[in-house]
Amino acid sequence: MSDFIQSYNNDPFLGNLSTPVSTSTFTKGLLNNLPAYRRGLSPLLRGLEIGMAHGYFLVGPFDKLGPLRNTDVALLSGFLSAVGLIIILTVCLSMYGNVSFDKDDAKDLLQTTEGWGQFTAGFLVGAVGGSGFAYLLLANIPVLQNLGLS
């Protein structure tokens, strides 16, 4: 078993282990295709793609598990709750960018105040759009609304 698990780059001081799963080409390819690590994406498009995914999956838990889950307005309240959480997350992302990045000479555009602002704007637009898309799907396709918890 010790032949399979080694220190990452043979450096035991990194605190990371190199396993057959974490260093496989499949895992590296999968992680490199995520918008956080994909090369060539502007911060705005990166935030848009991450926001769409987050907005899309936030509506369901608020709809099915929220306090108004057994009422006629459960879906609408789930959508509005998701948008409220998205606004809170956007404010937190904005605050993080303002206090973390003070130099504009970083080699990665996302590591600057302006780049992080673009990421945050893209996240807001994408997340609200993703929640709206999920709301429209659930409101107009009854089969989807009846799936899951009742």
UniProtKB/Swiss-Prot annotation:
InterPro entries the record matches: PSI_PsaL (IPR003757), PSI_PsaL_sf (IPR036592), PSI_suXI (IPR022980)
Primary location: plastid
Lumenal topology ranges: 94-118
The keyword Transmembrane helix is assigned to this record: yes
Keywords attached to this entry: Chloroplast, Membrane, Photosynthesis, Photosystem I, Plastid, Thylakoid, Transmembrane, Transmembrane helix
GO BP of this protein: photosynthesis
Membrane topology qualifier: Multi-pass membrane protein
Stromal face residues: 1-72, 140-150
HAMAP family: PSI_PsaL
Protein name from the UniProt record: Photosystem I reaction center subunit XI
Species whose genome carries this gene: Gracilaria tenuistipitata var. liui
Species classification: Eukaryota, Rhodophyta, Florideophyceae, Rhodymeniophycidae, Gracilariales
